[in-house]
Regions:
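Intrinsic structural disorder/low-complexity segments
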Residues: 50-51, 93
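Short, hydrophobic-biased segments on the C-terminal half of alpha helices
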Residues: 24, 53-54
Length: 100
């Protein structure tokens, strides 16, 4: 498998995790958030959120900066991620319309 296809499939796998997907959507709506803010918003433990953030970091979906006291996470490529989320939304709507 070529590198580009592999990376695309890896991104699909990451976003296939409902917690990761919710976190990415949340970060798309906010400039930057701490793990505790993300955990509160998605209803998961900080430990679980931190684990998922690590996977999203490895997948180059998110990045973080430290302000001394805490890490703040943001999307690495916000406009591209928002485009993917928008395309997924349109696909789901189209697929739902076909079933009817």
């Amino acid at each position: 498998m070529e590198e580009g296809s592999y990376r695309q499939s890896r991104l699909c796998r990451l976003l296939g995790n409902p917690v990761a997907f919710a976190m990415v959507r949340l970060l798309a709506e906010n400039k930057e958030l701490s793990p505790s803010e993300i955990a509160r918003a998605v209803g998961r433990s900080v430990q679980r959120v931190s684990t998922v953030l690590g996977a999203l970091r490895l997948g180059e979906v998110v990045r973080y900066e430290s302000d001394g006291k805490r890490n703040l996470y943001r999307l690495k490529h916000p406009s591209e991620v928002k485009g993917v989320l928008s395309a997924l939304s349109r696909f789901v709507k189209a697929a739902s319309a076909v079933r009817r």
